[in-house]
Amino acid sequence: MTHHIVIGAGLAGAAAAYSLTARGEDVTVLERHTPANDRGSSHGSARIFRYVYPDRLYTELVVRARELWDDLEAKSGTELITRTGAVDFGDARHTDLLAEIFEDVGVEHEVLDQARAAERWPQFAFDTEVLWHPDAGVIDAETTVRTMLERAVDTWRARIRTDWTVTEVARRSAGGFSVTSATGESVEGDRVIVAAGGWLPDLLGDLDLPEGFVDALPKFEVRQEQAFHMPYRDADADGRPSTPWPTFIHKSGEMFTYGLPGGRDAGFAGQKFAQFNGGKVIGSALEQDGQITDEMRTRMIDYAKRYLPGLVPEPYAETTCLFTNTPNEDFVIDEVDGLVIVSACSGHGAKFAPLLGEFAADLATGAGDVPDRFRVGAATT
């Protein structure tokens, strides 16, 4: 039986382990901290699940991913996505194009003018017409990681090693790989899947990749995003809103903002929102400092006052999160000589988690392929 080593226990790594063990493969997951820890991109209880993309490929992939989410929820008996619906608006959001893609793919949706949208969602101050799709929601990222890893371990085919910092991935002369930790421990396996997120830039030099493959990789940009929660103005005694809140994306010439109902980390008592790619650029996850800036806090307070009248503009539960971006925001999912890379996801990968795991497992086992756009391309051919 093939033994796979998965580096990283965030959403992508956990999904890879889950998919591989479901196929009868053996897996060791190596995590430098703990699964879904707050120094990565998969922590907390609130990530957006949405179908909206100005690109038909991604919308079609969300439809495929949703089937896998439903299957995971059914098998685990755990709700991982809370259905809230989503609104998209703003003069740079091009709701007509998005609605056309929805029509082609078959995603339920509705386009509302400003007046009708304001009547339905008085907690927003819309500046354009609005695209609504009811099947969007909020992903509990931390619970998803835990659930996928538990399912993998329950097969007796997976081991999880925590506080295990990878320092080298070397090819063995007899075939396969030897992965070494900062403490000198080693794990041997036949295949390696790297799902390291913001740590990938530091790992690249330690992966024993062919030169042509490395040269063909896009430039990775790691950002430390800043997110804020603000209380609901119509909150009950527990802080819960009396008016249901959808997730939202607001894209204007001024700023690209996204938001969603906050989860456990915010006591379910506020809307979480942030400026997309508004955080500072850092070399890798090793350089993060977790700091919230006064400039960004003020910017988001001003935004709430202008566009979110249903919130009290007083931030709480402030947090940071890492985005690992490619120049065109496409994913990088590829295999070369027994090593699979599943990163970067450019800040929009959470909704695809179980599908990313399927892609990784397909490449590692040779059972399938991935969209050509996600392949490194020039690689070793």
Model-derived segments and their meaning:
Residues 21-41:
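Glycine-rich FAD pyrophosphate-binding loop
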Residues 299-381:
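C-terminal catalytic lobe of FAD-dependent flavoproteins
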